[in-house]
């Protein structure tokens, strides 16, 4: 169980997770196409859980994406099928579609029960799970239902572990709080790292935003193609984007090129070769990059080449 916590940003709680002897885990995603490489981090983590004996359920969140203005249900189901084809190259998971779940009255009963135990302020605070600021949700009341539905997903599926990026933290913490009030199983939250936008975060001084909201605001996004490496990008596109990416010397925090190396390539593609040095752990690369042993140019060259190799295995 300890090894399953490698390349994990946070687990709530570690003790609860280590007490598990198998069980079930879930992740929900809005079906968009093309996906970016940030999705691969949680996909590989799900595959590790599956290999360790967990029942892994992937919720293709069509209704959630529709609420979030990402397209019609029909379009979203079609996108979901394409995403599944990529995920099938990483692991074999059970899939559930949000619009199928929404046909069950018991699901909506859960949504209402969760709403009864949650303040409006708490719901608004949980909206960064949508990739939106809390102030944006007042444009459309349905968006306030999104966090409630995400919590209902966890209880409806009856899973032990809720998996997601750090941007999903508030919804998962809401689920843990509400579980106690409703007498339901409290889910363990397992949060994987987020890859920052290739353009960086800009000046964040004085924003006073919580870390999960920062992740939601500055992560890679398919809607901003130059901020992300897309699964459909050509080798030329990948190399151009990496060479143009924000990658300050001696700085690893919110450095997207370092994050790609440490969170995706080294754990799931293999050791990274940089100028005769072989990095088998992200910590070793972090140390050398911070000390200037590895330069931004050297890091970009190695990351671009390794990333092209990884994506070649996943393209449809």
UniProtKB/Swiss-Prot annotation:
Binding residues for L-tyrosine: 26, 146, 150, 153, 168
A biological-process GO annotation: tyrosyl-tRNA aminoacylation
Motif 'KMSKS' region per UniProt: ranges: 219-223
Recorded catalytic activity of this chain's protein: tRNA(Tyr) + L-tyrosine + ATP = L-tyrosyl-tRNA(Tyr) + AMP + diphosphate + H(+)
Domain of life assignment: Archaea
Gene3D superfamilies: HUPs, Tyrosyl-Transfer RNA Synthetase
Subcellular location, record wording: Cytoplasm
InterPro entries: aa-tRNA-synth_Ic, Rossmann-like_a/b/a_fold, Tyr-tRNA-ligase, Tyr-tRNA-ligase_4, Tyr-tRNA-ligase_arc/euk-type, Tyr-tRNA_synthase
GO molecular function list: ATP binding; tyrosine-tRNA ligase activity
Positions bound to ATP: 222
Keywords (A to Z) from UniProt: Aminoacyl-tRNA synthetase, ATP-binding, Cytoplasm, Ligase, Nucleotide-binding, Protein biosynthesis
Enzyme Commission number: 6.1.1.1
GO CC, alphabetical: cytoplasm
Pfam families according to UniProt: tRNA-synt_1b
Family membership: Belongs to the class-I aminoacyl-tRNA synthetase family. TyrS type 4 subfamily.
Record function comment: Catalyzes the attachment of tyrosine to tRNA(Tyr) in a two-step reaction: tyrosine is first activated by ATP to form Tyr-AMP and then transferred to the acceptor end of tRNA(Tyr).
Subunit structure and binding partners: Homodimer.
Protein name according to UniProt: Tyrosine--tRNA ligase 2
């Amino acid at each position: 169980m300890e090894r399953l916590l490698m390349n994990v940003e946070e687990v709530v709680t570690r003790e609860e997770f280590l007490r598990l002897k198998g069980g079930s885990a879930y992740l929900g995603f809005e079906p968009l196409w093309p996906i970016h490489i940030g999705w691969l981090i949680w996909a590989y983590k799900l595959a590790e859980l599956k290999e360790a004996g967990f029942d892994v359920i992937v919720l293709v969140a069509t209704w959630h994406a529709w609420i979030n203005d990402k397209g019609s249900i029909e379009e979203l189901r079609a996108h979901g099928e394409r995403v599944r084809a990529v995920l099938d190259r990483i692991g074999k998971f059970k899939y559930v579609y949000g619009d199928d779940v929404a046909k069950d009255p018991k699901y909506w009963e859960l949504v209402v029960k969760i709403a009864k135990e949650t303040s409006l302020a708490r719901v608004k605070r949980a909206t960064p799970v949508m990739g939106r600021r809390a102030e944006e949700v007042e444009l459309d009341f349905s968006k306030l239902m999104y966090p409630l539905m995400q919590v209902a997903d966890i209880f409806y599926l009856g899973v032990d572990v809720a998996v997601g990026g750090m941007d999903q933290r508030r919804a998962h913490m809401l689920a843990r709080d509400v579980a106690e009030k409703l007498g339901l199983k409290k889910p363990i939250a397992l949060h994987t790292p987020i890859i920052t936008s290739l353009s960086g975060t800009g000046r964040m001084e004085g924003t006073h935003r919580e870390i999960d909201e920062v992740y939601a605001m500055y992560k890679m996004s398919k809607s901003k193609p130059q901020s992300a490496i897309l699964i459909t990008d050509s080798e030329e596109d990948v190399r151009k984007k990496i060479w143009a990416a924000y990658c300050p010397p001696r700085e690893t925090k919110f450095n997207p090129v370092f994050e790609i190396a440490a969170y995706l390539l080294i754990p799931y593609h293999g050791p990274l070769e940089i100028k005769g040095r072989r990095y088998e752990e992200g910590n070793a690369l972090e140390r050398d990059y911070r000390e200037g042993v590895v330069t931004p140019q050297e890091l970009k060259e190695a990351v671009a080449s390794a990333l092209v190799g990884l994506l070649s295995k996943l393209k449809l």
